[in-house]
């Protein structure tokens, strides 16, 4: 807004702002590893006195948090992890807690941004990610309140992903029908749920850092293009089916790494 401090991040995502507690909202940008332009990406950060501030998918999820349960508890992250100051990328392989933090942050990003891409392509709209983090938080909180334990694992399941996607499609007036016309067919909805689940559960820290990066780069690059293709009706059916049968091959071919 006018009169508020603003800045731009450098190519490494580093930024400087006045050292006083304030909410931080970022718009746009690209993924530094994959080079993908992240159209209408919006990330958020609640006001904090921390001198080192990390704006991420998890701080954006917490920005939507209106309850009394913190994100670490909701997603079973170790209490030593400070999502507001610990960089989820640079800490990879320093500890099992740091690896889980990286995985959860990447998964939350994919769940929010993939649905943003699908909805915006389907509705010819330009919603930013804030709305989708809010929907995702609501789904997570509802499952937590219903007694689901170990939500960091549960967000990888069909039960969670299907319910979350259904709620997003409904909130954006995208209904199911037997034809593609103005709505989407039930088969497209099923395909979307399937490929999102396949990618979310694939995201993890591997012993080989090249494999870890390849999975994440694929998830923030080619996978998003496939989501958009599903939305506009140009997706290749064989390729979409491969997400369930042979995702490793898709990633290896796209990222030029060994499939094993």
Located regions from the model:
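Feature for extracytoplasmic/surface-facing segments of secreted or surface-associated proteins
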Residues: 1-260
């Amino acid at each position: 807004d006018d009169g508020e401090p603003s800045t731009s991040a450098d190519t490494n995502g580093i930024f400087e702002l006045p050292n006083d507690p304030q909410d931080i909202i970022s718009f746009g940008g690209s993924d530094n590893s994959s080079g993908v332009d992240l159209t209408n990406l919006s990330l958020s950060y609640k006001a904090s006195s921390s001198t080192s501030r990390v704006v991420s998918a998890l701080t954006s999820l917490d920005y939507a948090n209106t309850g009394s349960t913190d994100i670490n508890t909701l997603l079973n992250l170790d209490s030593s992890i400070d999502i507001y100051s610990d960089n989820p990328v640079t800490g990879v392989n320093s500890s099992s807690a740091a690896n889980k933090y990286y995985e959860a942050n990447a998964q939350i990003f994919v769940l929010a941004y993939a649905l943003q891409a699908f909805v915006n392509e389907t509705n010819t709209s330009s919603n930013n990610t804030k709305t989708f983090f809010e929907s995702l938080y609501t789904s997570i909180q509802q499952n937590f309140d219903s007694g689901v334990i170990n939500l960091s694992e549960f967000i990888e399941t069909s039960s969670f992903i299907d319910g979350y996607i259904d709620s997003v499609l409904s909130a954006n007036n995208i209904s199911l029908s037997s034809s593609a016309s103005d709505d989407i067919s039930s088969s497209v909805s099923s395909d979307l749920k399937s490929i999102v689940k396949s990618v979310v559960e694939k995201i993890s820290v591997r012993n080989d850092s090249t494999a870890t990066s390849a999975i994440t780069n694929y998830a923030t690059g080619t996978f998003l293009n496939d989501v958009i293709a599903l939305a506009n009706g140009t997706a290749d059916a064989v390729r979409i089916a491969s997400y369930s049968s042979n995702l490793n091959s898709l990633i290896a071919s796209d990222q030029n790494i060994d499939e094993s």
